[in-house]
């Protein structure tokens, strides 16, 4: 469609503020018991650190992660060739507006809104301080930048900047735009894909290559039709990633590409669709890493884990930038997922690793959690702090 007017964008921003932000800081939350994270720096060796974050990407619908349909032929080929590390991930939140800033600001424990405002260990901030040029390329709207660290981003491109290109090419617009970037000596690049956001077929229906594999018309039930459309959108995502990796492989020097989803998706379980709910299918995301010209052991911190949370992935990315973030509050077997609100008295859920799998606690209001249970998540005084 036509570019949106400044009035439209102003109203959009005001509506976002009115719905999500206004008055929330006046809701006095109990003080959080958490100690500040410590950051130390060393000279980075990586030349390029790329992050691909796809919308609504649920790992158990990816062929590369065992799904019976071949929804990810390119990624599966990388894995089969021993080039791609693949792990089940744990999302930071159940909506894009929550998960993305919590991930980028390396926040583990809920109730620390000052870390969203001050951004002491935001990935873009760490990257810029370490001499990286910083890029944000998104097929979504610019309002997602609100708490993402936009003041530390050198080049930002969103859907509003190239409306015609994005309407015609969808996520492939980003791979079209990548060659135009003038890379510096070191580059931190965030690529934010729309991917499998509903309505799923809108993400791939204009694509001129034959990738849609499963039928979405005819006498199909909603479950079958929507499920097929979702799988087709994932298949389209795989095609976009293939283009991104082709350009990543043209670069030189030590480089890393991490792929994840902002959150998962409900696909008809108990007749519920979408996300925004603290339920296991919405927490379920992939974490996949491609390394080139990397030193031995660069992936060990991730490869040794069965599950990788967004927070843990962020710590690993920070290390690629030469920044080591130590969290004295961390328990490596306990993770937190934030509900659909970024600020205020949001619902949260604790996820605990066990030998049998992930254990999901009942969602709880942040205010109630801070009044008691939060204290019990802290390491014992004689227990050494986990570096992650």
Label every model-predicted segment.
Residues 1, 125, 142, 246-250, ...:
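Membrane-interface soluble catalytic domains
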Residues 1-51, 56-214, 284, 310-339:
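Active-site-proximal alpha/beta segments of enzymes that process anionic O-linked groups
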Residues 35-39, 222, 270:
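Hydrophobic alpha-helical segments with strong N-terminal bias
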Residues 50-51, 233-275, 314-321:
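Metal-dependent active-site segment of extracytoplasmic phospho-/sulfohydrolases and closely related
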Residues 62, 104-108, 227, 269-272, ...:
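Short acidic, glycine/proline-rich loop/turn micro-motifs
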Residues 66, 70, 249-295, 345-346:
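Histidine-centered active-site microenvironments of extracellular/periplasmic hydrolases
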Residues 143-146, 194-243, 247-251, 276-284, ...:
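Active-site-proximal cap/lid insertion segments
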Residues 198-200, 267, 296-298:
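Short acidic/glycine-rich loop or secondary-structure boundary segments that cap or lie
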């Amino acid at each position: 469609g036509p570019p949106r007017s400044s009035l439209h964008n102003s109203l959009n921003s005001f509506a976002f503020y009115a719905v999500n932000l206004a008055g929330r800081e006046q809701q006095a939350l109990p003080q959080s018991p958490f100690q500040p994270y410590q950051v130390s720096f060393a000279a980075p060796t990586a030349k390029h650190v790329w992050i691909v974050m796809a919308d609504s990407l649920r790992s158990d619908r990816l062929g590369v992660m065992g799904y019976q349909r071949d929804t990810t032929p390119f990624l599966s080929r990388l894995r089969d060739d021993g080039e791609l590390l693949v792990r089940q991930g744990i999302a930071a939140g159940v909506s894009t507006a929550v998960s993305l800033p919590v991930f980028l600001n390396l926040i583990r424990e809920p109730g620390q809104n000052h870390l969203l405002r001050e951004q002491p260990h935001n990935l873009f901030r760490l990257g810029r301080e370490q001499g990286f040029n910083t890029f944000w390329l998104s097929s979504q709207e610019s309002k997602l930048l609100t708490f993402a660290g936009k003041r530390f981003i050198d080049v930002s491109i969103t859907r509003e900047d190239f409306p015609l290109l994005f309407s015609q090419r969808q996520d492939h617009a980003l791979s079209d735009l990548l060659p135009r970037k003038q890379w510096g000596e070191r580059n931190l690049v965030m690529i934010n894909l729309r991917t499998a956001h509903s309505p799923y077929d809108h993400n791939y229906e204009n694509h001129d290559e034959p990738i849609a594999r499963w039928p979405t018309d005819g006498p199909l039930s909603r479950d079958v039709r929507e499920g097929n459309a979702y799988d087709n959108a994932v298949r389209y995502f795989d095609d976009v990633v293939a283009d991104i990796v082709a350009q990543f492989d043209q670069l030189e020097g030590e480089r890393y590409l991490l792929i994840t989803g902002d959150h998962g998706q409900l696909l008809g379980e108990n007749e519920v669709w979408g996300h925004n709910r603290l339920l296991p299918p919405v927490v379920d995301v992939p974490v996949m890493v491609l390394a080139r010209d990397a030193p031995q052991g660069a992936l060990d911190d991730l490869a040794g884990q069965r599950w990788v949370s967004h927070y843990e992935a962020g710590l690993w990315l920070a290390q690629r930038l030469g920044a080591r973030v130590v969290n004295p509050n961390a328990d490596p077997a306990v993770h937190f997922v934030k509900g659909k609100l970024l600020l205020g008295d949001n619902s949260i859920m604790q996820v605990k690793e066990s030998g049998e799998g992930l254990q999901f606690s009942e969602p709880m209001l942040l205010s109630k959690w801070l009044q008691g249970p939060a204290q019990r998540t802290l390491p014992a005084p004689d227990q050494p702090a986990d570096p992650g």
